[in-house]
Amino acid sequence: MFISAIERVSKFTRPVNSVMRTYGGKQLIPGSSTIFFVNDRGYAITCKHVAELLLGAENININFNNFKRERQQFANDGKFKTNVKGLELKYKFNPDTLIQVKNNFIDCVDTMSGFTCHAHPTLDLAIIKFNDYKTLHYQDCARFLKDSSKIKQGKFLCRLGFPFPEFNNFTFNTTTDDIEWTREGISHSPQFPIEGMVTRFLAENNQLYGIELSTPGLRGQSGGPLFDEKGTVYGMQFSTKHLHLGFDIVDKEIMVNNGVKKISDYSFLHLGQCIHVDAIKAFLKQHEVEFYEED
């Protein structure tokens, strides 16, 4: 049903690969998010929470570099550990503090000086503009649904994103105490589509802003497009709602491997939530970003 649509949408949907590290963690944490392009001028949209992570990475990294610079000034003597403890208090570092975030835009543009971001004041929506690139590495751009009255309960739609990161082209440099991207390893993760039926609509202050689907949006699909069987874009995945079903099972005895075990289960229904196409188009118009529509 969505074969041709996925092929079409994949031409302008791209992953953002991220590698994170906590102060007390010994392993690097890979993650992915999704953006998709709306024109041939380097404009893309994604979730505001994704954009905030991208924007916040620089400050997080600068803060840790300042910490390292001060730490290097300590003499390696009996007072070293005590001095480092004081420095940790100064920078408010604890084992769970995020100290490094490295991001990599995959197959978007050749090079760039940076990006400009416009975040929606209330919705989980943001515009990203790639700056000073020479060549685009995406082949097409989104076509948004022109008449949103066609979106009705029971309509089957699809989302595309990168929820299961498999890239491993990064390493930890113990000498510099830093995360580094490498030329070795896997630089891409497979795209992952997931379908769902339109169940309800989301509104606030009598203003429609979202579409609810019968299946969850997965971690890493945030910022990815919601589209129909033609590849026409209806919205953008931004979160998943968890509804308690009330079918609770407490200490029920069942047979497991020829033995009796007690189990408990609390069931939830996981529903995807997407920003409505009309809200996206209104935000693009507000910032005078060119986009395209189709029936």
Segment roles from a protein language model:
Residues F2-R8, Q27, N61-H137, K146-S148:
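Conserved catalytic-core segment of clan PA serine endopeptidases
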Residues F12-N83, N131-Y133, L160, F227:
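Catalytic histidine site
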